[in-house]
Amino acid sequence: MSQQETHGFQTEVKQLLNLMIHSLYSNKEIFLRELVSNAADASDKLRYEALTNDALYEGDGELRVRISTNKEKGTVTIEDNGIGMTRDTVIEHLGTIAKSGTADFFKNLSGDESKDSQLIGQFGVGFYSSFIVADKVTVRTRAAGHGSDEGVQWESAGEGDFTVDTIVKETRGTEIVLHLREEEKEFADDYRLRSIITKYSDHISVPVEMWEEGTPAIEATEEQEAVAATDGQWQSMNKATALWTRNKSDVSKEEYEEFYKHISHDFTDPLLWSHNRVEGKQEYTSLLYIPSKAPWDMWNRDRKHGLKLFVQRVFVMDDAEQFMPSYLRFVQGLIDSNDLPLNVSREILQDNKVTTALRTAVTKRVLGMLEKLAKNDAEKYQTFWAEFGQVLKEGPAEDMVNKERIAGLLRFASTHTEDAAPTVSLADYVSRMQEGQSKIYYIVADSHEAAANSPHLELLRKKGIEVVLMSERIDEWLINHLTDFDGKQLHSVTRGDLELGDLEDAGEKEAQEKLETESEGLVKRIKDSLGEKVSAVKVTTRLTDTPACVVAGEGEMSTQMIKLMEAAGQAVPESKPTFEINPEHPLVARLNDEQDEALFAQWSDLLLQQAQLSEKGSLADPSAFIKLMNEMLLAKLK
């Protein structure tokens, strides 16, 4: 009995359809790739479900995808005999976008067609790509294991709504009929579709078939023998073997790239990939891709990530995150294991020796891919770093075993060059360390400019000692977990003493000690004047051109960490900076000569707030600072 209902599309679907039709118009043939890919996935899912319920095959275990055209009607039909859908599944999957972060996706759209088409590709348009070429789409489907009277028909013109009806469908699976727009009738041509299938779907592991017309009989002549008539039949247009099961030497670059687009639904080619078959104690095949562009929702906590899992070439699940650490969540690909049970679940994967061993192996494989890229193609590695560098910086906190390898892959700016681009590795830095230098000096600031121009670098610049410049939000978090590299301690130039060690000669040490002794009275006066505003006042070991600076004491939170915690709404323990003065600077020398205690207090406070402004980029009470500045300027004008 017919049960026709009309449903409105979810708002986001309407937006996506409108955007897609306009942004993907120049790449419209991808509709076939997306629909064939979905049909192949439906076959994979049936094959997996049938492992425990063979009756789902309904006597038809030859899984395939069939594509046909009708030039007169102007239609293209994509039909599979896979898992099929129930009425509820149809409404859920063909009327809504069940993705977290959808609102953020729409915010990221810029109006630039080429950029937006990339974003839409990353988002994954799937079934909705039908409307790029069709002004009406009809879907007929029946779920495996359900009766023929439980078929479902879905139909829409891709505007505001769609209808759903109950129909009789004898065969299981899904049939999608595209009623082509007048200007897209070129796609109702077998030859055109064959070329697209060959281009996009050669790697699909089920046969993608088209109808091959029969040929009439040819009678014998003096020139040639008789030829018997042939019947029309469905012919496979693709190799129909799982690409990763083939030898690497038999797979072309183009096939690897198209397979990446199939599993990732990305429109752009991958940056690099690695295809490996491992035999021995463990038996598995991995095909791992590093994309060329970061996904739009990479920082969304709810975003699904992970590898496709196959067991003995049978698809088991998408997004198996157990095989890839979070800091490598951008990696796409699959793993096909011979050692896991076919009925494996996410729960079983969670605490499984085979899973742990596979995760260890593929993690090392990806790090090896990146190390090789960094060594052999620095420019291409910079492309990778620009997209995924901040994610990789999560690694040292997450992966203690591979911390040193991850650290070797990190890139930063440094005082070695004027360029703000992060091109310097820690190995580069170590190779340039001066004789007697035992530490890797670094600074974390709000921006590259703030780091490069920080007064804390003055003495180190004068001595020609390189400093790593860090200015990304994650850097303070990173540095709390990356304390050394290649046996060299990482040391902040804004914390405690500089600890130059052998880089400071005996004459410099003697001069510093003499200056500290001569300045004891001034240091005490400033401390008494500032009181509880600072934890201590001392003569600087790092300034040459600036009158004063503030530094964090050893074991205390840095300015950047305080900012991170405040931004996250966390309580921050109260801390007071150490105030360092440069007695050789004219302003501090003038302060030393000031006999008026009120003026002395004002000057001390002004120098402290200047130092805090330079370090933090802001003040707790900017109005008080401006008032103090104005008072002192007026006093000078009188």
UniProtKB/Swiss-Prot annotation:
InterPro entries: HATPase_C_sf, Heat_shock_protein_90_CS, HSP90_C, Hsp90_fam, Hsp90_N, Ribosomal_Su5_D2-typ_SF. One of its GO terms (molecular function) is ATP hydrolysis activity. It is found in: Cytoplasm. Residues 1-346 are annotated as: A. Residues 564-638 are annotated as: C. PROSITE patterns: HSP90 (PS00298). SMART domains: HATPase_c (SM00387). GO terms for cellular component: cytoplasm. Gene3D superfamilies: 3.30.230.80, 3.40.50.11260, Heat shock protein 90, C-terminal domain, Histidine kinase-like ATPase, C-terminal domain. Residues 347-563 are annotated as: B. CDD domains: HATPase_Hsp90-like (cd16927). It comes from the Bacteria. Keywords: ATP-binding, Chaperone, Cytoplasm, Nucleotide-binding, Stress response. It holds the Pfam family HSP90. Molecular chaperone. Has ATPase activity. HAMAP family: HSP90. Belongs to the heat shock protein 90 family. NCBIfam families: PRK05218.1. Homodimer. This is Chaperone protein HtpG. It comes from Shewanella sediminis (strain HAW-EB3).
